[in-house]
């Protein structure tokens, strides 16, 4: 009798932990008017503590090929009440700013991906939950996976 009490909770835990990732999407509301929801399901890695995900939000813009440009705005993280999941939100993209290097007016414009300004936005790598980002219509969400090893190096005293 005692054994069955022990096995039942383990069985229940195993059933709950194998719920498909699609079921987790129920926690994330649909995008509001003027916004688009982007979803990334990460593949499982052997040691996910050694990886990070960089979220990159921007837009394709036809501009000169010389100056450096960026959009104002920021990625915010919000906790979803009752679920404990995090969603990421960019409320507005822009205005665009950049350097003012003189450009030949006859120089043809090129299509470039212009991102939000500021530091890279890194989040924990977690293949068990989707990464969900809400952005204004017309914006694009890209990502990079950053990996390292478990080795570390000592710094010299100085």
Regions found by a protein language model. Give the residues of each.
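Bacterial N-terminal signal peptides
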Residues: 7-15
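N-terminal export/targeting and maturation segments
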Residues: 19-64
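Positively charged n-region of N-terminal signal peptides that target proteins for export
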Residues: 1-5
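Solvent-exposed loop and beta-edge segments used for protein-protein assembly and interaction
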Residues: 32-34, 47-49, 82, 125-127, ...
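Mature extracytoplasmic domains of secretory-pathway proteins
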Residues: 49-118
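C-terminal partner/receptor-binding element of secreted or periplasmic proteins
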Residues: 124-158
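A structural detector for beta-sheet-dominated domains
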Residues: 41-43, 56-58, 72, 91, ...
